[in-house]
Amino acid sequence: MRVLFKNGTVVSGKGTRRADVLVDGEKIRRVAREIHVDDAQIVDAAGMLLMPGFIDAHTHFDLDVCNTTTADDFASGSRAALRGGTTTIVDFACPNKGETLHDGLRLWHEKADGKCACDYGF
């Protein structure tokens, strides 16, 4: 599905500018002052900021610490991240005492697989 965001303010590492953004599936295909296509859903982005997805490189989902477990697991934490514009998280994978790093990482993958709503890494 193609979506064309019209008249938004694009925010990038080079500053801000008024532009249209054409997205095809999960990829940004074009950013330009004026884009015209016939086969895209049009979204009026006037007065809105168009920014890339953010990366949170320090999360702790479903982590047992100090006799308690963190409030968010991968399902709730990733949905909250997406609502705030974060599209990728990097979680702290901590093996249990006596576990190998490989086994600890496998456990974290099991906690996230099928539950995490955004991209993730460890």
How would you describe each model-predicted region?
Residues 1-4, 9-53:
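Histidine-rich, glycine-flanked metal-binding segment
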Residues 91, 121-122:
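Short catalytic-loop micro-motif centered on adjacent basic/acidic residues
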